């Protein structure tokens, strides 16, 4: 996989921060289903910084901007600068990749999709976007890159990162927008015993589960939340959040989802979709 980033660290634990689905707009006052996404994202970042936790790497797992605007991507970059840590990104279904390539190319942003993290771990960032539609699919090119990279680093524990979800949410309206070829992903991963976990966003809710023996993690959006186990489109009153991950030298993972505590953002519960 091209664009390899090497994070040299002799310490036994690598600490990651995942933020996902900010859905920023050109207009800072714009709302998504009743929530000002600029304000909610700013609040998430503020509370992360107040914790004073030292992260090694930040993962931004898609749907960074809702309306393909230059201003949205420029503002995202500016808002990430205070962390002074490399920020790696993947596209979500709402993102416009030409704009991502244009604006997410300056520090702290980094376009690498293969991260060598310390002596024991690697993270592989996959593009599951099918432009113009909500569901996801990994192209044959992405699957081939994944297989090639895993084959070159068989001794490293591996975290696979993408936008779209693998596990059903038990919400019919949302599960039609899943990763359509998860079976092909499973076939590629199967021979590589050091693959430990899969991380994604997209579903605007927390998941800590298992799929084919891999730990599976999904993370709340920094804006609106989708209510699980609902046949029809439903919003939740849970607050915006983020995920912190520790990758240990023995291959184990410790992780925690946190949500904002110092403010409240409530969507318009009467909305029937977006």
From Swiss-Prot:
<dbReference type="InterPro" id="IPR004843">
    <property type="entry name" value="Calcineurin-like_PHP_ApaH"/>
</dbReference>
<feature type="binding site">
    <location>
        <position position="163"/>
    </location>
    <ligand>
        <name>Fe cation 2</name>
    </ligand>
</feature>
<dbReference type="InterPro" id="IPR046379">
    <property type="entry name" value="cAMP_phosphodiest_CpdA"/>
</dbReference>
<keyword id="KW-0547">Nucleotide-binding</keyword>
<dbReference type="GO" id="GO:0000166">
    <property type="term" value="F:nucleotide binding"/>
</dbReference>
<dbReference type="GO" id="GO:0046872">
    <property type="term" value="F:metal ion binding"/>
</dbReference>
<keyword id="KW-0114">cAMP</keyword>
<feature type="binding site">
    <location>
        <position position="63"/>
    </location>
    <ligand>
        <name>AMP</name>
    </ligand>
</feature>
<feature type="binding site">
    <location>
        <position position="202"/>
    </location>
    <ligand>
        <name>Fe cation 2</name>
    </ligand>
</feature>
<feature type="binding site">
    <location>
        <position position="204"/>
    </location>
    <ligand>
        <name>Fe cation 1</name>
    </ligand>
</feature>
<dbReference type="GO" id="GO:0004115">
    <property type="term" value="F:3',5'-cyclic-AMP phosphodiesterase activity"/>
</dbReference>
<feature type="binding site">
    <location>
        <position position="23"/>
    </location>
    <ligand>
        <name>AMP</name>
    </ligand>
</feature>
<feature type="binding site">
    <location>
        <position position="23"/>
    </location>
    <ligand>
        <name>Fe cation 1</name>
    </ligand>
</feature>
<comment type="similarity">
    <text>Belongs to the cyclic nucleotide phosphodiesterase class-III family.</text>
</comment>
<dbReference type="InterPro" id="IPR026575">
    <property type="entry name" value="GpdQ/CpdA-like"/>
</dbReference>
<feature type="binding site">
    <location>
        <position position="63"/>
    </location>
    <ligand>
        <name>Fe cation 2</name>
    </ligand>
</feature>
<dbReference type="InterPro" id="IPR029052">
    <property type="entry name" value="Metallo-depent_PP-like"/>
</dbReference>
<feature type="binding site">
    <location>
        <begin position="93"/>
        <end position="94"/>
    </location>
    <ligand>
        <name>AMP</name>
    </ligand>
</feature>
<feature type="binding site">
    <location>
        <position position="93"/>
    </location>
    <ligand>
        <name>Fe cation 2</name>
    </ligand>
</feature>
<keyword id="KW-0479">Metal-binding</keyword>
<feature type="binding site">
    <location>
        <position position="204"/>
    </location>
    <ligand>
        <name>AMP</name>
    </ligand>
</feature>
<dbReference type="Pfam" id="PF00149">
    <property type="entry name" value="Metallophos"/>
</dbReference>
<dbReference type="InterPro" id="IPR050884">
    <property type="entry name" value="CNP_phosphodiesterase-III"/>
</dbReference>
<feature type="binding site">
    <location>
        <position position="21"/>
    </location>
    <ligand>
        <name>Fe cation 1</name>
    </ligand>
</feature>
<keyword id="KW-0378">Hydrolase</keyword>
<protein>
    <recommendedName>
        <fullName>3',5'-cyclic adenosine monophosphate phosphodiesterase CpdA</fullName>
        <ecNumber>3.1.4.53</ecNumber>
    </recommendedName>
</protein>
<feature type="binding site">
    <location>
        <position position="63"/>
    </location>
    <ligand>
        <name>Fe cation 1</name>
    </ligand>
</feature>
<comment type="function">
    <text>Hydrolyzes cAMP to 5'-AMP. Plays an important regulatory role in modulating the intracellular concentration of cAMP, thereby influencing cAMP-dependent processes. May coordinate responses to nutritional stress, ensuring optimal competence development.</text>
</comment>
<keyword id="KW-0408">Iron</keyword>
């Amino acid at each position: 996989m091209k664009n390899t980033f090497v994070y040299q660290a002799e310490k036994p634990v690598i600490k990651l921060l995942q933020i996902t689905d900010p859905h920023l707009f050109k207009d800072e006052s714009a709302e998504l289903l009743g929530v000002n996404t600029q304000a909610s994202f700013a609040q998430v970042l503020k509370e992360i910084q107040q914790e004073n936790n030292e992260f090694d790497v930040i993962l931004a797992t898609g749907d960074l901007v809702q309306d393909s605007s230059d201003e949205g991507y420029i503002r995202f970059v500016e808002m990430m600068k205070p962390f002074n840590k490399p920020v790696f990104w993947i596209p979500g279904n709402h993102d416009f990749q030409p704009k991502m390539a244009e604006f997410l190319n300056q520090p702290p942003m980094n376009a690498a999709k293969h991260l060598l993290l310390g002596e024991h771990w690697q993270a592989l960032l996959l593009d599951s976007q099918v432009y113009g539609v909500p569901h996801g699919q990994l192209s044959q090119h992405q699957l081939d890159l994944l297989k090639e990279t895993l084959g070159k680093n068989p001794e490293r524990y591996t975290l696979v990162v993408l936008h779209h979800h693998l596990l059903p949410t038990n919400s019919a309206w949302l599960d039609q927008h899943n990763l359509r070829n998860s079976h092909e992903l499973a076939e590629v991963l199967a021979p590589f015993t050091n693959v430990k976990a899969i991380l994604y966003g997209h579903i605007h809710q927390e998941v800590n589960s298992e799929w084919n023996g891999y730990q599976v993690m999904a993370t709340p959006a920094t804006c609106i939340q989708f209510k699980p186990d609902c046949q029809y489109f439903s919003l939740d009153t849970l607050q915006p959040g983020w995920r912190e991950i520790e990758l240990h030298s023995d291959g184990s993972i410790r992780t925690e989802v946190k949500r904002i505590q110092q403010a409240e953002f409530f969507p318009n519960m009467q909305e029937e979709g977006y």
